[in-house]
Regions:
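Right-handed parallel beta-helix/beta-spiral solenoid domain characteristic of secreted/periplasmic
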Residues: 89, 98-142
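Extracellular beta-strand repeat scaffolds in secreted/surface proteins
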Residues: 77-81, 102
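Right-handed parallel beta-helix
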Residues: 101-106, 124-135, 149-167, 179-181
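Beta-strand repeat architectures
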Residues: 70-77, 126
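Extracellular/surface-exposed low-complexity repeats and stalk/linker segments enriched in Gly/Pro
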Residues: 1-27
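Extracellular beta-strand/beta-solenoid scaffold signature
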Residues: 111-120, 136-152, 167-181
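Short, surface-exposed terminal/edge motifs of secreted or surface/virion proteins that either
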Residues: 27-42
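Right-handed parallel beta-helix/beta-solenoid
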Residues: 13, 40-68, 85, 103-104
Length: 181
């Protein structure tokens, strides 16, 4: 017979376990708020009031930029971007299998700082979702492009879902470094 699952519980309104109270994958339940909490070790946070010197591992210790979170990300990480406008030093080269997920399409705006460069260099298995892109780029620059300095033999495409591109002169997605869609 399988071992029963044990869940830490609290009936105190608003009480959540501290990071030190849970192990990775362990669950806690606040029965008053009907909120289930788990600790994941593969999530990085970005907020408008964050600091790129922070760890990014907790919402209260978030990075200030998407590029700051990407710089410490590894395969399988999810970067959660809180509502706000983020001017990013591009291009930002994403490691394989890294996801960037905004709070909401209408609340997360990303502005490329370097008009002559692509915004994101995507890799196999990347996932971009719930962001809007604004600003101006040089004609031929893209929001998403494969890194022209790397060769990918991909069995897994990058995915872009529920994003809006309002960047003047830009291309949404560049394939093989030069072809656009």
């Amino acid at each position: 017979m399988a071992t029963p699952i044990r869940i830490k519980r609290s009936a105190v309104p608003g009480k959540k376990p501290q990071v030190t109270d849970l192990q990775v994958g362990e669950l806690a339940l606040n029965t008053y708020d009907a909120e289930l909490v788990t600790l994941r070790d593969n999530v990085l946070y970005v907020t408008g009031d964050g600091d790129d010197n922070n760890t990014g591992k907790k919402l209260g210790d978030a990075k200030a930029s998407i590029a700051g979170a990407v710089a410490i990300s590894t395969t399988g990480d999810v970067i959660r971007v809180s509502a706000g406008t983020y001017t990013e030093n591009n291009p930002i080269a994403l490691p394989k299998q890294v996801s960037i997920v905004g709070d909401s399409l209408r609340e997360v705006t990303v502005v490329p700082q370097n008009a002559g460069s692509d915004l994101f260099y995507v890799a196999p298995g990347n996932y971009l979702s719930e962001m809007s892109f604004t600003g101006t780029m040089t004609a031929g620059s893209a929001i998403c492009a494969f890194n022209p300095n790397k060769i990918y033999y991909s069995t897994q495409s990058p995915y872009v879902s529920n994003c809006t591109n309002f960047v003047t002169n830009s291309i949404g997605l560049k394939i093989d470094g030069s072809k656009s869609i």
